[in-house]
Swiss-Prot record:
PANTHER family: LIM DOMAIN-CONTAINING PROTEIN JUB (PTHR24219:SF4). One of its GO terms (molecular function) is metal ion binding. Residues 1-20, 28-49, 189-225, 287-317, 407-427 are annotated as: Disordered. This is LIM domain-containing protein jub.
Length: 728
């Protein structure tokens, strides 16, 4: 049926339009049907119209879907690359002259062309690229700055691997201040940031339903109050200079606020709504981002040179302070003049965070010179065009921390000012704010939390210091000693004098020891007596016969009656006449021991039985001139007791030996007793010994023994005599 109609339609071209519409109405067009036709082909000439109507279109398969999706992904990827290349400034290399200032300032000089290697890729090293698994070798002796804004915000389970930099923070420019908010993802555990800390904390308002400012880009309020976008890339020095220690750029617990320095101030609203009090701003280096010197413009948005001041604030940044809060701040923070100096107070939390880091931050009050500010204020009040000097940021060496910064030659530019648009005081304030700090403050006085000699502005102005060094304390740690001896010293001297007098008196009236062997006078006092070789000497009389040195308490040598000290005896040839040891026969070159008219080495004079050294110990010599100690001599040669059989030795504690000799026998005194009754036998008449059959008996026991025997031939024995002999 359908085929016939299509053939008829081919034959009658005039009715083709109506038939075609009827056919299209009958066809089921849609993707919900299970076996519906996708659509009819209506494009074609009159000749191939039938063929087009006969061919039905089928649904796309998996291959077609894959090709279409891949094409769409490629297009999206290309669009993203174009967008990134449009607003991203990739890694930049700076000349070697800016290496030192790179650690202090973010972008001190206009960037140069990246030097490519033979493969066409710049060899640099980025910490963020290292997280992604990439390793790029850095160029030698050149600092590399990484555009932290390129990667956006990211989070990881490894908190320590995340770069703690402003690249993952949201920024907004409010009334000339570029505010860098801390990380919302909880980068710092000790500084929790609430989730609702958005643009409301910055004091900015956004229209209902309006698009929020893009992440990673600064939102600024224009002259009309609308939000405007500024592509302000943030760079971080990721390679420290050789010999310089890498330092953190900001405290982790504080938010970073950059102050935009405008060349001119044409509107009174920008000066009246100052945003934050200048007294609450912290001293920090100036950062300059220069586009070109030829594209200068007087407008605030298209300024060729934008200056940002790094101002550290607490993470809980409050809204814009009111007049009452500003008045309270001014009560605690002194301000010299409206258009003159700006006194920057230091936040205690900021100092605590800086002190807890790994470097010493020298926070200070910046005392600005009021001459330039007053001159600009007068020119603005009179309505004459003021000529403002724009000075390039100084290049500070790596060792500069507390001194003057050598600035480049200034360049002048004429900027029209309007005195009718704003009062004199706000205009002077704005002019001072737009003036670089390097021009108005040639001397930056940096004070350390610890006391130092250069802690005042006068000392810093007179003696500018170069180098981060710790100065000596202005006060003396050790108090000066008073003139003359102290009371304790006087007491010690008095006691010493009394002791010396007592010693002299005791020597004069001391103990008498005897007559000196040399001079024949009396020896009194222990300090004057000296005993040697069995004789008594005065201390001053017993001296070396060669050098006259006193020999008390020292080694000496007696050579033929003459005494020598050890030095004279050893090195003056007197050892040739030295005596020989009576035991070993060798010369006695050191200490000598004399006994029984002979000389011995102290080590050679020993007991022949027990081999004990007898130096200073009593000894005995037998008939063969053998040397014995006392105990060994008595054990060998002492008489034996006839009763107990033991040797009769001297009584303990004495050198005397007592024995009893009776009946040609030797007895101990304690062994000479009656064997029957135990009575001590002596030479007394009633205590004499009456021996019987070889036994010691007294007279009574002797008679009893005879009575018991009842022998007619037994006769009475006469008593025997006993003698007591003492041996010394």
């Amino acid at each position: 049926m359908t085929t016939q109609r299509t053939q008829t339609q081919a034959r009658n071209p005039g009715n083709s339009d109506s038939d075609y519409e009827t056919l299209m109405q009958r066809l089921h067009i849609g993707g919900g049907g299970g076996a519906g036709v996708g659509g009819g082909g209506g494009s074609g000439g009159p000749g191939d119209g039938g063929v087009a109507m006969r061919s039905y279109q089928r649904s796309p398969g998996a291959i077609e879907n894959y090709l279409q999706e891949s094409q769409q992904q490629q297009q999206q990827h290309q669009m993203q690359q174009m967008q990134q290349l449009h607003h991203n400034q990739d890694y930049k290399l700076y000349e070697r002259g800016n290496i030192i200032a790179a650690s202090k300032y973010a972008t001190p000089r206009p960037v140069e062309q990246i030097q490519h290697t033979h493969n066409g890729s710049a060899q640099i090293y980025a910490p963020t690229a290292q997280i992604l698994g990439q390793r790029i070798a850095p160029q030698k002796h050149s600092p590399v700055y990484e555009n932290l804004e390129f990667y956006g915000q990211f989070d990881s389970n490894h908190k320590r691997a995340q770069p703690q930099s402003p690249g993952s923070r949201q920024s907004a420019i409010l009334n000339g201040y570029l505010l860098m908010q801390p990380i919302r993802a909880g980068r710092f555990a000790h500084t929790p940031v609430p989730e609702n800390q958005g643009s409301a904390s910055l004091g900015t308002t956004r229209a209902a339903g309006g698009p929020p400012p893009p992440s990673g880009r600064s939102a600024a309020l224009g002259p009309t109050g609308d939000l405007e976008e500024h592509a302000a890339p943030i760079y971080e020095n990721i390679i420290p200079h050789s010999g310089q220690r890498a330092q953190p750029q900001a405290s982790p617990a504080t938010a970073t606020m950059y102050q935009e320095m405008q060349p001119t101030s044409n509107s009174s609203g920008s000066s009246s709504t100052a945003g934050l009090d200048l007294n609450a701003l912290l001293a920090s280096p100036m950062h300059q981002r220069s586009i070109s010197s030829n594209t200068a413009s007087s407008s605030s948005l298209g300024s060729p040179t934008q200056r940002y001041r790094n101002l550290s604030l607490p993470s809980h940044l409050s809204p814009v302070p009111t007049a009452q809060s500003v008045a309270k701040l001014q009560q605690h923070t002194p301000v010299k003049s409206p258009g003159g100096a700006i006194n920057v107070s230091v936040n205690p939390n900021y100092i605590e965070d800086i002190n807890s880091s790994d470097y010493v931050c020298m926070t200070a009050n910046l005392h600005r010179n009021t001459a330039a500010g007053l001159a600009t204020g007068r020119a603005a009040a009179t309505g004459a065009p003021a000529q403002r000097t724009v000075q390039e940021p100084p290049i500070i060496t790596s060792s500069l921390a507390m001194g003057m910064a050598t600035a480049a030659p200034p360049t002048t530019s004429n900027a029209p000012t309007s005195a009718a648009a704003a009062p004199a005081a706000p205009t002077s304030t704005a002019s001072l704010r737009a003036t670089p700090i390097a021009m108005t403050a040639p001397l930056a006085v940096a004070t350390s939390p610890t006391p130092s000699q250069g802690s005042t502005a006068v000392n810093a102005a007179l003696k500018p210091r170069r180098g981060l060094t710790k100065n000596l304390l202005p006060y003396s740690v050790t108090p000066p000693r008073p003139a003359g001896p102290t009371e304790a010293q006087r007491k010690i001297e008095e006691l010493t004098r009394q002791l010396e007098e007592e010693i002299e008196q005791s020597e004069e009236h001391g103990e008498y020891f005897g007559i000196c062997h040399t001079c024949g006078e009396k020896v009194k006092g222990a300090g004057q007596a000296c005993q040697a070789m069995g004789n008594l000497y005065h201390t001053n009389c017993f001296i070396c016969c060669s050098c006259g040195r006193a020999l008390r308490g020292k080694a000496f040598y007696n050579v033929h009656g003459r005494v020598y000290c050890e030095e004279d005896y050893m090195y003056s040839g007197f050892q040739q006449t030295a005596e020989k040891c009576a035991i070993c026969g060798h010369l006695i070159m050191e200490m000598i021991l004399q006994a029984m008219g002979k000389s011995y080495h102290p080590g050679c004079f020993r007991c022949c039985v027990c081999n004990e050294c007898l130096d200073g110990v009593p000894f005995t010599v037998d008939v063969d001139h053998k040397i014995y100690c006392v105990n060994d001599y008595h054990r060998m040669f002492a008489p034996k007791c006839a009763s107990c059989g033991k040797g009769i030795t001297p009584v303990e504690g004495t050198d005397e030996t007592v024995r009893v000799v009776s009946m040609d026998k030797d007895f101990h005194v304690d062994c000479y007793i009656c064997e029957e009754c135990g009575m001590q036998l002596t030479d007394e008449p009633d205590k004499r010994c009456y021996p019987l059959d070889g036994r010691l008996l007294c007279r009574g026991c002797h008679l009893q023994r005879l009575a018991l025997q009842s022998s007619p031939h037994a006769r009475h024995q006469e008593p025997v005599c006993a003698s007591y002999q003492y041996m010394g």
